[in-house]
């Protein structure tokens, strides 16, 4: 999209825009972004530029409030996990995946009910993403996207633990769908590095061997060199 000199760039996909023309505007530096949604825009811009460059995506701009940075990343993870949930619907059915499980040792109870109970995996996935969206859009806990109270930031860890179960179920029970989506988005890889960087989950709960595979591939590459 070439704009005349001095003309403001409309950073929005107009109705009727073709898929190949989505986001067809020049990148901005973070300092040039003057919207209250600047952090979200910056994260999404880096993902579009190269979703495999996880270190770049997770590196905050200088002086960025850490609570807001974690919050905006978690919102983005939930947005992208909806894409995985849509793909899972093709084979993750209530009569075949009757429980939200990962390995045989893990059965997860759904917190969307008054008393947590077992749900079919696809229902658990929907309930969990809906619950995360409700919390992250709550005016009570997150009235501002510019500054966030520490007591609200503390709630992000529980959201991380719950949405991670979507990755783990997909990995252990729908591996082809998981691999295809991961190869497109690097989403589980990015999420794993994110929660480790900010200590939002215990390493013992990170049961999808994403980083182990990375280390093995690195060692294999060095051996072949």
UniProtKB/Swiss-Prot annotation:
Residue numbers binding Zn(2+) 1: 92, 97, 169, 174
Coiled-coil stretches noted in the UniProt entry, renumbered to this chain: none
Keyword DNA-binding: no
UniProt KW keywords: Cytoplasm, Golgi apparatus, Membrane, Metal-binding, Phosphoprotein, Transport, Zinc
Superkingdom as given in the UniProt entry: Eukaryota
Stated name of the protein: MOB-like protein phocein
GO biological process, one term: negative regulation of hippo signaling
Iron is among the record's keywords: no
Primary localisation category: cytoplasm
Cellular component terms (Gene Ontology): cytoplasm; FAR/SIN/STRIPAK complex; glutamatergic synapse; Golgi apparatus; Golgi cisterna membrane; perinuclear region of cytoplasm; postsynapse
UniProt membrane topology term: Peripheral membrane protein
InterPro entries, per the entry: MOB_kinase_act_fam, MOB_kinase_act_sf
UniProt-annotated location(s): Cytoplasm, Perinuclear region; Membrane; Golgi apparatus, Golgi stack membrane
């Amino acid at each position: 999209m070439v704009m005349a000199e001095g003309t403001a760039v409309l950073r929005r996909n107009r109705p009727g825009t073709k898929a190949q023309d989505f986001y067809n505007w020049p990148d901005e530096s973070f300092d040039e972004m003057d919207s209250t949604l600047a952090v979200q825009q910056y994260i999404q811009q880096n993902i579009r530029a190269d979703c495999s460059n996880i270190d770049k995506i997770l590196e905050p701009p200088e002086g960025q409030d850490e609570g807001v940075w974690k919050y905006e990343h978690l919102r983005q993870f939930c947005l992208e996990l909806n894409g995985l949930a849509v793909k899972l619907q093709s084979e993750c059915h209530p009569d075949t995946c009757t429980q939200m499980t990962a390995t045989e040792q893990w059965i997860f109870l759904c917190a969307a009910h008054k008393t947590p109970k077992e749900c079919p995996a696809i229902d658990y996935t929907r309930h969990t993403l809906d619950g995360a969206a409700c919390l992250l859009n709550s005016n009570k806990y997150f009235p501002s996207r510019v500054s966030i109270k520490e007591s609200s930031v503390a709630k992000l860890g529980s959201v991380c633990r719950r949405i991670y179960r979507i990755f783990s179920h997909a990995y252990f029970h729908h591996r082809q769908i998981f691999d295809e989506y991961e190869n497109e988005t690097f989403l589980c890889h990015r999420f794993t590095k994110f929660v480790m960087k900010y200590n939002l989950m215990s390493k013992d709960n990170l049961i999808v061997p994403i980083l182990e595979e990375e280390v093995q591939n690195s060692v294999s590459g060095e051996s072949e060199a």
